[in-house]
């Protein structure tokens, strides 16, 4: 397994968005089977991509750990893009970028819904963040940008032209169940995202300090926690539901991944593990039985 680092290599954003543009047509076809909200669900994470340097290896790993299946597609120019499914539920996409000059780019990247991506990018810049790429048009999907927030955490922005996945789709094992920012300044980060996407902030007192939840349309959209040590760069952590977190964590190690934080009663009642896949992408496993 590769060593992982939570760093930003801006060059790979350009490649990612070019791939998304090329493969937006097959994604558009698949969206026709998803219940979509008539209104924009600003602040909601509405899509995720795994950027990896070895799609075949990543497919094997996630098939064993999360039970995923896949559909390989190609867009204009023959660029490959893999759609990820948990049962019949479309979960995310997967793209391969194997460029030795762009180290440490393997990661999960989430996209937040915004009403107007151009205005959102202007806001990001006004608060000390940056737009690494975009906004760009994604045929049949909408407009997207990839940004670094003021603390340099990477996230995508998506202004959907077809509607956002409706909140009636319940979380379940195998799909994304939560998104969490590990932050160097949780209060500042919460204010930034709340202002960017029109969200409310709810503060919860927890054993390790204040946990901030971002809400919009009456729904919890994401959480923000202080980073445990100063040597961790701020980053968004994607949580995937599993039936048994201890079993899933054991599968991670059996399939060549690494468990950074195993399930423990001292941390969120043992319901969560933080792991790294064999290519170096960090993610969380969350026990989800609802």
Where are these predicted regions, by residue range?
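Vicinal oxygen chelate
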Residues: 4, 23-40, 44-53, 83, 100-123, 128-177, ...
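Intrinsically disordered, glycine/charged-rich N-terminal periplasmic/extracytoplasmic linker segments
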Residues: 76-126, 132-133, 138, 224
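Residues that act as N-cap/strand-start positions at coil-to-secondary-structure junctions
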Residues: 78, 106, 208, 234, ...
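Bacterial N-terminal signal peptides
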Residues: 10-21
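Core segments of cupin and vicinal oxygen chelate
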Residues: 28-30, 49-89, 126, 134-142, ...
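Short hydrophobic transmembrane-like helices used for membrane targeting/insertion
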Residues: 6-8
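Residue-level hotspots at or immediately adjacent to binding/recognition sites across diverse folds
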Residues: 33, 39, 53-55, 115
């Amino acid at each position: 397994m590769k060593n992982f680092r939570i760093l930003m290599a801006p060059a790979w954003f350009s490649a990612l968005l070019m791939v998304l543009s090329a493969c937006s047509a097959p994604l558009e076809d698949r969206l026709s089977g998803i219940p979509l909200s008539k209104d924009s669900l600003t602040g909601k994470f509405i899509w995720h991509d795994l950027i990896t340097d070895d799609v075949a290896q990543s497919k094997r790993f996630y098939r064993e750990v999360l039970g995923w299946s896949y559909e390989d597609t190609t867009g204009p120019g023959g660029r490959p893009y893999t759609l990820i499914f948990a049962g019949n539920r479309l979960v995310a996409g997967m793209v391969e970028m194997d460029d030795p000059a762009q180290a440490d780019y393997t990661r999960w990247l989430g996209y937040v819904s915004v009403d107007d991506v151009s205005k959102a990018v202007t806001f990001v810049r006004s608060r000390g963040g940056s737009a690494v790429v975009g906004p760009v048009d994604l045929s049949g999907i909408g407009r997207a940008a990839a940004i670094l927030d003021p603390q340099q955490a990477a996230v995508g922005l998506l202004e959907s032209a077809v509607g956002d996945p409706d909140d009636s789709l319940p979380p379940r094992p195998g799909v994304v169940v939560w998104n969490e920012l590990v932050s160097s300044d949780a209060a500042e980060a919460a204010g930034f995202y709340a202002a960017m996407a029109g969200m409310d902030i709810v503060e919860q007192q927890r054993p390790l300090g204040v946990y901030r939840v971002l809400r919009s349309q009456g729904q919890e959209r994401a959480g923000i926690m202080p980073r445990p040590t100063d040597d961790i760069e701020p980053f968004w952590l994607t949580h995937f539901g599993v039936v048994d977190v201890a079993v899933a964590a054991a599968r991670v190690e059996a399939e060549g991944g690494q468990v950074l934080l195993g399930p423990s009663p001292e941390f969120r009642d043992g319901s969560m593990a933080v792991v790294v896949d064999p290519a170096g992408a960090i993610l969380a496993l969350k026990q989800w039985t609802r």
